A protein has these predicted regions:
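Juxtamembrane extramembrane loops of integral membrane proteins
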Residues: 13, 23-106
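Aromatic/His-enriched, Gly/Pro-containing loop or helix-boundary segments
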Residues: 1-4, 55, 63, 146
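Soluble non-transmembrane domains of integral membrane proteins
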Residues: 70, 74-303
Length: 303
């Protein structure tokens, strides 16, 4: 009887050790990795913060679209426009999908930032040098060349600051849902600068949620082959941050997803946060060195 008790005690102790190693030791490793990642994050620049006090005006979507100059885009699947104020993609409608079977209205996904249903995508460069002006959400870009974006004709936007730096965006569109954005800075001075590229998806409010068990609606990413799914209410309470070398990030609905693919072969930090608006953001962690009388360029993709 005593030997049976000893065997049982050994078996129980072994089970406790195995369970501890399975469920607690990896968590400790993960915590250590998060501490290291967070330390690295603190050393890098950060993308522009959301305008927390921006007023959401009570106007219609159509009226909001008239408040800034725009450049149209269209292919066989989507139609919309890019605001020249901020160079944001904030107007997109699906040509082949109806709101309901008994109506002719098409599904609209994106909307201007200054309405309640605001949902948009923007990108650019930032620098830790506070004396250098960079384009922001209020910058008005100029159109060079083509004045309509199609799958056969890309567009180019430009803006020049007072320090002799010219910022360019070349935007192309395939015949499906893929935008490719080539961002470039041309330095016409002898000065040297460091820049970080970023992209972000901004959504003003939580859409109607289906809340189906196997369906994720919220902020989503695949970072270094790890799937990340964060609900809206989770992000309202806690910010998510992770450094990765490859992947995508975005916001998903029942039927639709809006996503960013950061530049290849560069490490980037992904952030999901909420500051009166939801944001899915990436920023490169290593600076691009812009030498005098030279240029730098990076490419990101939007789906």
């Amino acid at each position: 009887m005593e030997s049976k008790n000893v065997i049982a005690a050994i078996a129980l102790s072994t089970a406790v050790i195995v369970l501890y190693s399975l469920f607690f030791l990896p968590e400790q490793k993960s915590n250590n990795q998060n501490i290291a990642d967070n330390a690295k994050v603190e050393q890098s620049s950060d993308a522009p913060s959301l305008e927390q006090k921006e007023t959401l005006v009570s106007i219609s979507r159509d009226e909001a679209l008239t408040q800034s100059e725009r450049i149209q885009f269209e292919n066989n699947n989507i139609i919309g426009s890019i605001s020249l104020k901020g160079a944001s993609i904030d107007d997109l409608t699906f040509k082949k999908y109806k709101v309901s079977l008994d109506k002719e209205d098409r599904v609209t996904l994106l909307g201007p930032r200054n309405i309640k249903e605001g949902y948009l995508i923007e990108s650019g460069f930032v620098t830790s040098d506070k004396n250098v002006d960079v384009p922001n959400s209020k910058t008005v870009w100029l159109v060079e060349g083509n004045n309509k974006l199609t799958n056969e004709s890309p567009i180019k936007l430009s803006w020049t600051n007072n320090q002799g730096l010219k910022f360019e965006k070349e935007i192309s569109l395939d015949d499906e849902y893929l935008f490719t954005v080539k961002q470039k800075i041309i330095n016409k001075t002898n000065n040297k600068y460091d820049f970080y590229s970023y992209g972000q998806i901004i959504r003003n409010e939580i859409p109607e949620i289906i809340d189906f068990l196997i369906l994720h609606e919220g902020l989503i990413a695949t970072l270094d082959d790890e799937l990340i799914e964060e609900d809206y209410d989770d992000i309202q309470e806690n910010k998510f941050t992770k450094i990765a070398k490859k992947g995508f990030l975005g916001i998903s609905d029942k039927y639709w997803i809006t996503s960013l693919i950061p530049p290849k072969s560069t490490e980037f930090k992904t952030t999901f946060d909420y500051k009166n608006k939801f944001r899915a953001n990436f920023i490169t962690t290593d600076p691009l060195e812009l030498n005098g009388n030279s240029s730098i360029e990076e490419e990101l993709k939007i789906i």
